[in-house]
């Protein structure tokens, strides 16, 4: 470390030790908590299946910042820069539309070989991979229904796509030695008030059971399901609601995905984690930033991001919660978006690990809520930034906003040529 950072580090460690926090133990734990970065920030959820395709499914990437990735080589290059600017362990989350093939591949015919380059790249960079079937931006999802479709042939197509996706996910886990979390999200819903809310959910229930019927090694693959309140064009009814998927995950013992933008604006997923963990074996978190709706803005180091991290740490959910990000902002440099959001998630985890939780819990048990509030507020002023800077330097990444210099240089040399 440089002298100034080392001096600040030593003083900060003393301050935290005075309140009973072991900084070295906190950093050791932080190094066991990978954050899964989402590939789709790099190209506005376009994928490689049809570069001229239109994004559908009630989601939207707004903006036209130049330099978005147009193929897998460009996307991996962009990711490599982002990864080099973020300290600690990372993973990469892929959608099925990011397959690589010289010939068109139907979604229900995808195979592990279509993702072999991603696996080789992940091995090189010591990354785990996660996966998602892509039930959107396709002619057979154009009417707003996939796994709950009333047409059995269309429904079967999406069942087969999800089944094929599970095999790809298991391939990731087997090849990389770390389980791939495969999350199923579907856009199914209606713009206006439906007469029959039950039948689509009955079809979805049966379809999901068929999707997960093949037994896969849990050391290689983990199933997750994700709810949503509404989407563009599905404002009045969403088949896969919170209640539906909470019941499904609890009864089938799959993981449950909680997306920060998929609930009413007055709801927060940090308050849902402890309840859900009583009933499901695992949680997948999609940390995002909804602005008035599921806008998928870049994650900030704000109160909710901190609360999410604190819930994981306070309840020792390290082995049961999988931390992923889900945002896509096309109005700013896409590599910078990755770096900002992922560094913020890691900062939140570090701050949570530096909290004197045992001391605060004892105050709560004694009913001393005055001291609890006082210490909660005072610990916000402890020098966690000095620990963060030391952690960045130990991981050979820029300590502060100097990471932006690398992004600007890459933008001038590489992105401007696209």
Swiss-Prot record:
- UniProt entry tagged with the keyword Metal-binding: yes
List the cofactors: Mn(2+)
Q: Catalyses which reaction?
A: L-rhamnopyranose = L-rhamnulose
Localization in the cell: Cytoplasm
A Gene Ontology molecular function term for this protein is:
manganese ion binding
Keyword annotations for this protein, in alphabetical order, are:
Cytoplasm, Isomerase, Manganese, Metal-binding, Rhamnose metabolism
* Annotated GO biological process: L-lyxose metabolic process; rhamnose catabolic process
Q: What class of enzyme is it?
A: isomerase
- PANTHER family per the UniProt record, alphabetical: L-RHAMNOSE ISOMERASE (PTHR30268:SF0)
Show the NCBIfam families listed in the entry: PRK01076.1, rhaA
The record's family statement is:
Belongs to the rhamnose isomerase family.
User: What is the role of this chain?
Assistant: Catalyzes the interconversion of L-rhamnose and L-rhamnulose.
- HAMAP family noted in UniProt: RhaA
Assembly notes: Homotetramer.
Q: What is this protein called?
A: L-rhamnose isomerase
């Amino acid at each position: 470390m440089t002298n100034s950072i080392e001096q600040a580090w030593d003083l900060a460690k003393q301050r935290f030790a005075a309140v009973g926090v072991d900084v070295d133990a906190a950093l050791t734990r932080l190094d066991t908590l990978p954050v899964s970065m989402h590939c789709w920030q790099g190209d506005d959820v376009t994928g490689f299946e049809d570069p001229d395709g239109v994004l559908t499914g009630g989601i939207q990437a707004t903006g036209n910042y130049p330099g978005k990735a147009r193929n897998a080589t460009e996307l991996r290059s962009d990711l490599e820069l982002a990864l080099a600017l973020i300290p600690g362990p990372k993973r990469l989350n892929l959608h099925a539309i990011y397959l690589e093939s010289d010939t068109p591949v139907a979604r229900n015919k995808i195979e592990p070989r279509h993702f072999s380059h991603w696996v080789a790249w992940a091995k090189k960079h010591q990354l785990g991979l996660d996966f998602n079937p892509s039930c959107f931006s396709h002619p057979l999802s154009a009417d707003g229904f996939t796994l709950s479709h009333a047409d059995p042939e269309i429904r079967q197509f999406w069942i087969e796509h999800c089944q094929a996706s599970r095999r790809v996910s298991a391939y990731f886990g087997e090849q990389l030695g770390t389980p791939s979390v495969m999350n199923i999200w579907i856009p199914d819903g209606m713009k206006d008030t439906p007469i029959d809310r039950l039948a689509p959910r009955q079809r979805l229930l049966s379809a999901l059971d068929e999707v997960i019927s093949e037994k896969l090694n849990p050391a290689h693959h983990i199933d997750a399901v994700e709810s949503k309140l509404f989407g563009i064009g599905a404002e009045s009814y969403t088949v896969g609601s919170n209640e539906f998927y909470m019941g499904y995950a609890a009864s089938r013992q799959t993981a449950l995905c909680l997306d920060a933008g998929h609930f009413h604006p007055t709801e927060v997923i940090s308050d849902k984690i402890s309840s859900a963990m009583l009933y499901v074996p695992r949680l997948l978190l999609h940390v995002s930033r909804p602005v008035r709706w599921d806008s998928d803005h870049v994650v900030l180091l704000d109160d909710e991001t901190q609360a999410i991290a604190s819930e994981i740490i306070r309840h020792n959910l390290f082995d049961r919660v999988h931390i992923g990000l889900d945002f896509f902002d096309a109005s700013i440099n896409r590599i910078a978006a990755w770096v900002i959001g992922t560094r913020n998630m890691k900062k939140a985890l570090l701050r949570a690990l530096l909290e004197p939780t045992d001391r605060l819990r004892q105050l709560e048990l004694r009913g001393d809520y005055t001291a609890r509030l006082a210490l909660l507020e005072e610990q916000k002023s402890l020098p966690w930034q000095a620990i963060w800077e030391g952690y960045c330097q130990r991981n050979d990444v820029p300590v502060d906003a100097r990471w932006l210099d690398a992004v600007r240089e890459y933008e001038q040399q590489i992105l401007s040529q696209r």
